[in-house]
UniProtKB/Swiss-Prot annotation:
It comes from Pyricularia oryzae (strain 70-15 / ATCC MYA-4617 / FGSC 8958). This is Appressoria-specific virulence factor GAS1. Appressoria-specific virulence factor required for appressorial penetration in host and lesion development. Disruption phenotype: Does not affect vegetative growth, conidiation, or appressoria formation, but reduces in appressorial penetration and lesion development. Induction: Expressed specifically during appressorium formation. GO terms for cellular component: cytoplasm. It holds the Pfam family Egh16-like. Its main location: cytoplasm. The gene is GAS1. Keywords: Cytoplasm, Signal, Virulence.
């Protein structure tokens, strides 16, 4: 099964919502490269309409307010499968961050209410269960999350990593992973994104690639096994998927 097919099989559909800002690139102070969960790099960036320009922008609303958000095009953001897809596309390690360093992001503002100011939070175990506020040193401009002049524009968004920060999560075979979640306060949103980042020095680039390949292969085997046993992942509820993950049935 291809990586794209695997992603399609493991992400649930969700009610469609519009999003107006997307983190299209993220780089750590020590290198690496990534982007926000759910971002599709083929999405055109020269318009403001819902289709196709808002399809991969994340919104945190309702049941998704305290999670990883959702997009119009992909539904609920899934950390594991989407991180695999991001690494496969960039061919790079995740953004490499240092305690006391920074995560440097590019925020594409789609339309007027994708504007700043943005706030950022960090989750140290990649579960998304608990978030701590971190300092934003550079934010897209705006007042009350509105700025019509900023539509269709890329802006820098920089968040500081706290001193002595530890990261303990494992995602897509990558160890020592933290999640950084940034959003504005738009009434129709909030809009923003979630970026997976890794403590610098955790894995060599070669080890990171091997771990990613092993993780993808393991997921393919698990999906194949579930199909043989009569499971259709796309038909399962989020609670059922979470239970399968806890039982080690899926990655």
């Amino acid at each position: 099964m291809s990586l794209k097919s695997l992603i399609a099989a493991t992400i649930l559909a969700a009610p469609l919502v519009a999003g107006h800002g997307a983190i299209i690139k993220a780089v750590g102070d020590a290198g690496g490269e990534g982007m926000g969960l759910g971002v599709v790099t083929s999405t055109p960036r020269d318009g403001t309409r819902r289709d196709p320009f808002q399809q991969d922008s994340t919104r945190f609303k309702g049941q998704q307010a305290d999670t990883f958000g959702e997009t119009v095009g992909g539904g609920q953001n899934d950390v594991e499968s989407m991180t695999k897809a991001i690494m496969a596309e960039t061919g790079s390690q995740l953004p490499q961050i240092s305690p006391g360093g920074s995560l440097q992001m590019t925020l594409h503002q789609v339309n007027g209410d994708g504007a700043g100011p943005y706030t950022c939070e960090l989750n140290d175990d990649a579960s998304g269960a608990q978030w701590q506020q971190i300092r934003v040193t550079t934010t897209p401009p705006g007042r009350n999350s509105r700025n019509r002049d900023g539509a269709m524009t890329d802006f820098p968004l920089v968040a500081e990593i706290p001193q002595r920060q530890a990261c303990t999560g494992t995602v897509a075979g990558q160890t020592n992973v933290c999640l950084v979640r940034c959003m504005n306060a738009a009434r129709a949103g909030p809009f923003g994104g979630v970026v997976a980042a890794q403590l610098a020095g955790s894995q060599t680039p070669q080890a990171a690639r091997r771990a990613l390949a092993e993780s993808v292969k393991r997921s393919e085997l698990i999906v194949s096994g579930l199909k043989k046993r009569g499971y259709n992942i796309a038909d399962l509820s989020q609670e059922e998927i979470d239970e399968l993950r806890r039982d080690g049935e899926i990655a």
